[in-house]
Amino acid sequence: MTDAQIRSLIGRPPASGAWREGDPVADRLFASVGGVDLEAGGRIPSVRVAYETFGERDPDGGNAVLVLHALTGDSHLRGPAGPGQPTGGWWSGIVGPGLAIDTDRWFVVAPNMLGGCQGTTGPASLAPDGAEWGARFPFITIRDQVAVQAALADALGIDVWAAVVGGSMGGMQALEWGVGLPGRMRRLAILAAPAIASADQIALNSVQAEAIRMDPAYRDGDYFDAADGDGPHRGLALARRMALLNYRSPDELNQRFSRSWQSGISPMGDEGRYAVESYLDFHGNKFTRRFDATSYIRLIDAMSSHDVGRDRGGVEAALASVRAATLVVGIDSDRLFPVPDQRLVARHVPGSVDGGEVVVISSDYGHDGFLIENEAVGRALARLLDTPA
């Protein structure tokens, strides 16, 4: 662990790592998009979306590209961390001048998703009664999140996106755009995402949510007034540790850590630990300083709800409604959303730019390969964006 990493963990974790009203705005822009009626019932009476933009918009808006983040991402595609922005840009090697999504050519819009905790309305936001929503924040689905993104597009005056791009949970949303709003994009990129959440994926999500709920400090979601160190950081960190095991591959963990000891102290007793355990601890602890526990629960519940075929005649029928030129990318070592998940999509969308095949990227990094393998991912995205549509 580096000195910089150690400094980032000094002090007790906050009750919630969410961006809160009054925090530095950083590069966020905000749009109020009104209320949203939810697929599972209920209504959020007022939704505000935090988003960032990159590049210049053409007068006719024809160069607008929507980029959708993964479960624990945010609107900060590129740029440094700083006050109000706990992490650096998560796709700085893909989005920017001269890069695959070239901001000298494209106007990129990146929103924080509904239910998130970096500026868009979610559990850490204030409800109409002036208190945090907490666990009162209603159950939401991928379709609800896309409805809010579509409302943002309306507010920005963007009728048709040049492309909608998403990876992981963002890829679920991008596919829902293609199925549910087929006339609103010309190109579509689905990276490391399925058309439907499997039983295996739902099971993984459920144990993460339970880890948070079993933390006594969770207090049924009513923890926002807790002092630093007294919030549900243990449960949230444990959920993050569970998730990391599916974000990375066995080969990478074995190559990086093998059976090495942390700090040279033998783990064959009560004092020492394996280095891989320390790695998980570090990332769990770090995560609690930038995320909210109830937001995490609501978002993984939304992932589990994902099924583009629900009430549409099944998955294959739903995929057949996609009209955009479509790129589907998978990672060969992905054990969260393995390549067969992407093959189902590629074979049934009519506009596949690869003849119904998946672009399979070889990577030791598992699911996170779509965030790390910039050269291969960038090459595929650039090809899609150069496709006439």
Swiss-Prot record:
GO terms for molecular function: homoserine O-acetyltransferase activity. The active site is at 168 (nucleophile), 334, 367. Residues 63-371 form the AB hydrolase-1 domain. The keyword Transport does not apply. It is found in: Cytoplasm. GO terms for cellular component: cytoplasm. InterPro entries: AB_hydrolase_1 (IPR000073), AB_hydrolase_fold (IPR029058), HAT_MetX-like (IPR008220). Keywords: Acyltransferase, Amino-acid biosynthesis, Cytoplasm, Methionine biosynthesis, Transferase. Its EC number is 2.3.1.31. Substrate binds at residues 240, 368. GO terms for biological process: homoserine metabolic process; methionine biosynthetic process. Pathway: Amino-acid biosynthesis; L-methionine biosynthesis via de novo pathway; O-acetyl-L-homoserine from L-homoserine: step 1/1. It catalyses: L-homoserine + acetyl-CoA = O-acetyl-L-homoserine + CoA. Belongs to the AB hydrolase superfamily. MetX family. Homodimer. This is Homoserine O-acetyltransferase. The lineage of its organism: Bacteria, Bacillati, Actinomycetota, Actinomycetes, Micrococcales. The gene is metXA.
